[in-house]
Every structure is written in C-alpha cells, then in structure tokens.
Amino acid sequence: MKNEGTLAEVVFLRDVRGGRPENAVGIGEFWYEPEIWSLPLSPAAKVLYAGLCSFLGHGEIHRKDLRATLKDSSDEGIAEALEELVRNKLLEPASEAGPSGYAVRAIG
C-alpha cells in the first residue's frame, strides 16, 4: 500500500512472526511482543503494530478498525505509521496477500 493518504477498505495480513514467545501480551493467537513499546518508533507506529497483531488471527483489518486503532490520526497519518513499520522491518509488503497486504514480522 503506497503512502497516498488513502487507506484500502481491507488490508490483508499474514503472520510471519514465528512461535509465541513466553513474554507475549494477549490471549491465544491474539498477541504481540511487549518490546514494541521500547523501540525508537513514533507512538502511532507502536500502537498500530500492537493493533495489527491483534487482527492477525482474522487475516485482515478493515479501514474502520485501522481508524479505531489510531483514533486521533487521519488516514494519511495511519498510512505514514504503516510506512514507518515497513521502514523498520516490522511489516513487509506482502504481494501474495494482494496490493493492500502486509506480512507482520517479529521484533528483533
């Protein structure tokens, strides 16, 4: 997804994080690594990463859910947070998931 200030209606997600670590936060398949909070990322990118992880079990997140995750952000701000996660190798554009998809990677 290009940073054009617009978001796809549905962003497809693929989990490539590997096994759930012992210190994971969350329940069942809906978990994230707490180390996200100590990374040198914007607050929006940190919150978005945790939010995306909570939707991995569904394999997708809808635009309305992205907006709810980052309530005070514009669509352009959400797109910028997605790009920040790509730059920091926490998200990988997933061509097999479609033009609006990402593979979510583990921290470290």
Locations of regions flagged by a protein language model:
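Short recognition helix of helix-turn-helix/winged-helix DNA-binding domains
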Residues: 1-65
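Winged helix-turn-helix DNA-binding recognition segment
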Residues: 52-108
